[in-house]
Amino acid sequence: KNMITGAAQMDGAILVCSAADGPMPQTREHILLSKQVGVPHIVVFLNKQDQVDDEELLELVELEVRELLSSYDFPGDDIPIVAGSALKAVEALQANSSIGKGEDEWVDKIHDLVAQVDEYIPAPERDIDKPFLMAVEDVFSITGRGTVATGRIERGKVKVGEQIEIVGIRDTTQSTVTGVEMFQKTLDEGMAGDNVGVLLRGIQKEDILRGMVLAKPGSITPHTKFEAEVYVLIG
Protein backbone atom coordinates (compact mmCIF):
# COMPACT_ATOMS: atom_id res chain seq x y z
CA LYS A 1 0.00 0.00 0.00
CA ASN A 2 2.67 2.50 0.99
CA MET A 3 4.87 1.63 -1.98
CA ILE A 4 1.99 2.23 -4.40
CA THR A 5 1.04 5.53 -2.74
CA GLY A 6 4.62 6.76 -2.80
CA ALA A 7 5.37 5.64 -6.33
CA ALA A 8 2.28 7.37 -7.69
CA GLN A 9 3.80 10.72 -6.71
CA MET A 10 7.31 10.26 -8.06
CA ASP A 11 8.99 12.19 -10.85
CA GLY A 12 11.67 9.49 -10.87
CA ALA A 13 12.95 6.62 -8.76
CA ILE A 14 16.11 4.86 -7.64
CA LEU A 15 15.72 1.10 -8.01
CA VAL A 16 17.96 -0.65 -5.47
CA CYS A 17 19.06 -4.17 -6.38
CA SER A 18 21.60 -6.45 -4.70
CA ALA A 19 24.78 -6.86 -6.72
CA ALA A 20 25.40 -10.10 -4.83
CA ASP A 21 21.97 -11.69 -5.38
CA GLY A 22 20.66 -10.05 -8.53
CA PRO A 23 17.01 -9.10 -9.12
CA MET A 24 14.62 -10.59 -6.56
CA PRO A 25 10.84 -11.17 -6.94
CA GLN A 26 10.13 -7.83 -5.26
CA THR A 27 12.40 -6.13 -7.80
CA ARG A 28 10.04 -7.21 -10.55
CA GLU A 29 7.06 -6.02 -8.49
CA HIS A 30 8.64 -2.61 -7.92
CA ILE A 31 9.36 -2.19 -11.63
CA LEU A 32 5.82 -3.24 -12.56
CA LEU A 33 4.25 -0.88 -10.04
CA SER A 34 6.52 1.95 -11.17
CA LYS A 35 5.38 1.40 -14.73
CA GLN A 36 1.70 1.15 -13.96
CA VAL A 37 1.50 4.23 -11.73
CA GLY A 38 3.48 6.27 -14.23
CA VAL A 39 6.96 6.73 -12.75
CA PRO A 40 8.68 8.20 -15.83
CA HIS A 41 12.37 7.66 -15.05
CA ILE A 42 14.45 5.11 -13.12
CA VAL A 43 18.10 5.07 -12.06
CA VAL A 44 19.51 1.78 -10.71
CA PHE A 45 21.79 1.33 -7.70
CA LEU A 46 23.47 -2.08 -7.43
CA ASN A 47 24.03 -2.32 -3.69
CA LYS A 48 26.42 -4.65 -1.81
CA GLN A 49 29.15 -4.36 -4.44
CA ASP A 50 31.65 -5.02 -1.64
CA GLN A 51 30.34 -8.61 -1.52
CA VAL A 52 31.12 -9.25 -5.19
CA ASP A 53 34.70 -10.14 -6.09
CA ASP A 54 33.98 -11.31 -9.63
CA GLU A 55 33.64 -8.42 -12.10
CA GLU A 56 31.93 -10.72 -14.61
CA LEU A 57 29.25 -11.54 -12.03
CA LEU A 58 28.61 -7.83 -11.53
CA GLU A 59 28.28 -7.36 -15.29
CA LEU A 60 25.87 -10.31 -15.44
CA VAL A 61 23.65 -8.79 -12.75
CA GLU A 62 23.68 -5.46 -14.58
CA LEU A 63 22.66 -7.18 -17.81
CA GLU A 64 19.86 -9.03 -16.02
CA VAL A 65 18.54 -5.79 -14.53
CA ARG A 66 18.62 -4.05 -17.91
CA GLU A 67 16.70 -6.92 -19.54
CA LEU A 68 14.13 -6.86 -16.74
CA LEU A 69 13.61 -3.11 -17.13
CA SER A 70 13.27 -3.48 -20.91
CA SER A 71 10.64 -6.20 -20.45
CA TYR A 72 8.45 -3.59 -18.75
CA ASP A 73 9.02 -1.01 -21.49
CA PHE A 74 11.62 1.05 -19.64
CA PRO A 75 14.69 1.94 -21.76
CA GLY A 76 16.88 -0.71 -20.13
CA ASP A 77 19.87 -0.10 -22.39
CA ASP A 78 19.97 3.61 -21.56
CA ILE A 79 19.16 3.68 -17.84
CA PRO A 80 22.14 4.66 -15.65
CA ILE A 81 23.35 1.91 -13.32
CA VAL A 82 25.70 2.69 -10.44
CA ALA A 83 27.29 -0.04 -8.32
CA GLY A 84 28.35 0.61 -4.74
CA SER A 85 27.77 -0.22 -1.09
CA ALA A 86 25.43 1.87 1.02
CA LEU A 87 26.72 0.20 4.19
CA LYS A 88 30.36 0.94 3.41
CA ALA A 89 29.50 4.55 2.59
CA VAL A 90 27.60 4.98 5.86
CA GLU A 91 30.43 3.41 7.85
CA ALA A 92 32.95 5.74 6.21
CA LEU A 93 30.83 8.80 6.96
CA GLN A 94 30.25 7.70 10.55
CA ALA A 95 34.01 7.44 11.00
CA ASN A 96 34.61 10.82 9.34
CA SER A 97 31.61 13.01 8.56
CA SER A 98 33.73 15.53 6.66
CA ILE A 99 34.86 13.13 3.92
CA GLY A 100 35.09 14.93 0.59
CA LYS A 101 34.91 13.69 -2.97
CA GLY A 102 37.87 11.53 -3.93
CA GLU A 103 38.67 10.52 -0.36
CA ASP A 104 36.63 7.30 -0.15
CA GLU A 105 35.57 5.08 -3.05
CA TRP A 106 32.27 4.04 -1.44
CA VAL A 107 31.21 7.59 -0.61
CA ASP A 108 32.19 8.59 -4.15
CA LYS A 109 29.78 5.94 -5.46
CA ILE A 110 26.91 7.70 -3.68
CA HIS A 111 28.01 11.05 -5.12
CA ASP A 112 28.00 9.38 -8.55
CA LEU A 113 24.49 8.02 -7.95
CA VAL A 114 23.18 11.46 -7.02
CA ALA A 115 24.88 12.97 -10.08
CA GLN A 116 23.23 10.37 -12.34
CA VAL A 117 19.84 11.15 -10.79
CA ASP A 118 20.35 14.88 -11.39
CA GLU A 119 21.42 14.30 -14.98
CA TYR A 120 19.00 11.56 -16.06
CA ILE A 121 15.80 12.63 -14.31
CA PRO A 122 14.68 15.98 -15.75
CA ALA A 123 13.09 18.73 -13.69
CA PRO A 124 9.35 18.16 -14.19
CA GLU A 125 6.89 20.74 -15.40
CA ARG A 126 4.36 21.64 -12.71
CA ASP A 127 0.68 22.51 -13.19
CA ILE A 128 0.87 25.62 -11.03
CA ASP A 129 -1.70 27.58 -13.06
CA LYS A 130 -4.55 25.10 -12.48
CA PRO A 131 -6.94 25.08 -9.49
CA PHE A 132 -5.40 23.78 -6.26
CA LEU A 133 -5.72 20.04 -5.60
CA MET A 134 -4.00 17.84 -3.00
CA ALA A 135 -4.76 14.24 -2.09
CA VAL A 136 -4.62 13.64 1.67
CA GLU A 137 -2.08 11.00 2.68
CA ASP A 138 -2.07 11.48 6.43
CA VAL A 139 -3.70 13.56 9.15
CA PHE A 140 -2.44 14.53 12.58
CA SER A 141 -3.04 17.09 15.31
CA ILE A 142 -0.65 19.72 16.63
CA THR A 143 -1.40 20.71 20.20
CA GLY A 144 -2.50 24.31 20.38
CA ARG A 145 -2.52 24.79 16.60
CA GLY A 146 -5.06 22.43 15.07
CA THR A 147 -5.28 19.71 12.44
CA VAL A 148 -2.74 19.16 9.68
CA ALA A 149 -3.41 17.28 6.44
CA THR A 150 -0.31 16.12 4.59
CA GLY A 151 0.19 15.15 0.96
CA ARG A 152 1.66 16.12 -2.38
CA ILE A 153 0.09 19.04 -4.19
CA GLU A 154 -1.06 17.70 -7.56
CA ARG A 155 -1.74 21.05 -9.18
CA GLY A 156 -2.07 24.74 -8.47
CA LYS A 157 -1.02 26.66 -5.37
CA VAL A 158 -2.29 27.04 -1.83
CA LYS A 159 -1.63 30.12 0.29
CA VAL A 160 -2.08 30.91 3.95
CA GLY A 161 -5.47 32.56 4.48
CA GLU A 162 -7.16 30.93 1.48
CA GLN A 163 -10.42 29.02 1.63
CA ILE A 164 -10.31 25.36 0.59
CA GLU A 165 -12.79 22.49 0.36
CA ILE A 166 -12.35 19.03 1.88
CA VAL A 167 -13.91 16.65 -0.63
CA GLY A 168 -14.60 12.92 -0.75
CA ILE A 169 -15.92 10.03 1.39
CA ARG A 170 -17.99 12.39 3.55
CA ASP A 171 -19.97 15.56 2.88
CA THR A 172 -17.88 18.38 1.44
CA THR A 173 -16.77 20.91 4.06
CA GLN A 174 -14.86 24.17 3.93
CA SER A 175 -11.95 25.47 5.96
CA THR A 176 -9.31 28.18 5.95
CA VAL A 177 -5.61 27.44 5.53
CA THR A 178 -3.79 28.83 8.57
CA GLY A 179 -0.37 27.41 7.79
CA VAL A 180 1.72 25.61 5.17
CA GLU A 181 4.84 23.65 6.10
CA MET A 182 7.37 21.63 4.14
CA PHE A 183 10.30 19.76 5.70
CA GLN A 184 9.70 21.53 9.03
CA LYS A 185 9.85 24.97 7.41
CA THR A 186 6.95 27.41 7.41
CA LEU A 187 5.93 28.68 3.96
CA ASP A 188 3.64 31.42 2.69
CA GLU A 189 2.42 29.07 -0.04
CA GLY A 190 2.84 25.58 -1.45
CA MET A 191 2.71 24.71 -5.13
CA ALA A 192 2.34 21.71 -7.42
CA GLY A 193 4.96 19.06 -6.69
CA ASP A 194 5.52 20.09 -3.07
CA ASN A 195 4.99 17.59 -0.25
CA VAL A 196 3.40 19.75 2.40
CA GLY A 197 1.43 19.84 5.59
CA VAL A 198 -1.62 22.12 5.45
CA LEU A 199 -2.91 23.46 8.78
CA LEU A 200 -6.70 23.84 8.73
CA ARG A 201 -8.90 26.05 10.90
CA GLY A 202 -11.86 24.55 12.77
CA ILE A 203 -11.25 21.00 11.56
CA GLN A 204 -10.88 17.99 13.87
CA LYS A 205 -8.54 15.11 13.08
CA GLU A 206 -11.47 12.71 12.72
CA ASP A 207 -13.05 15.02 10.11
CA ILE A 208 -10.42 14.09 7.49
CA LEU A 209 -9.49 10.65 6.18
CA ARG A 210 -6.73 9.45 3.90
CA GLY A 211 -8.15 9.43 0.39
CA MET A 212 -9.98 12.73 0.71
CA VAL A 213 -8.69 15.73 -1.20
CA LEU A 214 -8.18 19.40 -0.45
CA ALA A 215 -9.22 21.60 -3.37
CA LYS A 216 -10.06 25.11 -4.46
CA PRO A 217 -13.76 25.65 -3.68
CA GLY A 218 -16.02 24.60 -6.54
CA SER A 219 -13.20 23.16 -8.65
CA ILE A 220 -14.02 19.44 -8.33
CA THR A 221 -17.09 17.25 -7.88
CA PRO A 222 -17.06 13.94 -5.96
CA HIS A 223 -18.37 10.84 -7.75
CA THR A 224 -19.70 7.53 -6.45
CA LYS A 225 -19.22 5.59 -9.70
CA PHE A 226 -16.17 5.36 -11.95
CA GLU A 227 -14.39 3.05 -14.37
CA ALA A 228 -10.94 1.76 -13.47
CA GLU A 229 -8.21 -0.47 -14.83
CA VAL A 230 -6.83 -2.72 -12.08
CA TYR A 231 -3.49 -4.53 -11.96
CA VAL A 232 -3.25 -7.54 -9.64
CA LEU A 233 0.07 -8.95 -8.42
CA ILE A 234 -0.12 -12.70 -7.81
CA GLY A 235 1.55 -14.23 -4.76
Curated annotation (Swiss-Prot):
Protein's name according to its UniProt entry: Elongation factor Tu
Species, as recorded: Leptolyngbya ectocarpi (Phormidium ectocarpi)
The protein's Enzyme Commission number: 3.6.5.3
Entry-linked Pfam families: GTP_EFTU, GTP_EFTU_D2
Main location: cytoplasm
Keyword Protein biosynthesis on entry: yes
PROSITE patterns given in the database record: G_TR_2
Cytoplasm recorded as keyword: yes
GO molecular function, one term: translation elongation factor activity
GO CC annotation terms, alphabetical: cytosol
Reaction it catalyzes: GTP + H2O = GDP + phosphate + H(+)
Annotated tr-type G domain residues: 1-125
Assembly and binders: Monomer.
InterPro entries: EF-Tu_GTPase, EFTu-like_2, EFTU_2, P-loop_NTPase, T_Tr_GTP-bd_dom, Transl_B-barrel_sf
Superkingdom in the source lineage: Bacteria
UniProt subcellular location: Cytoplasm
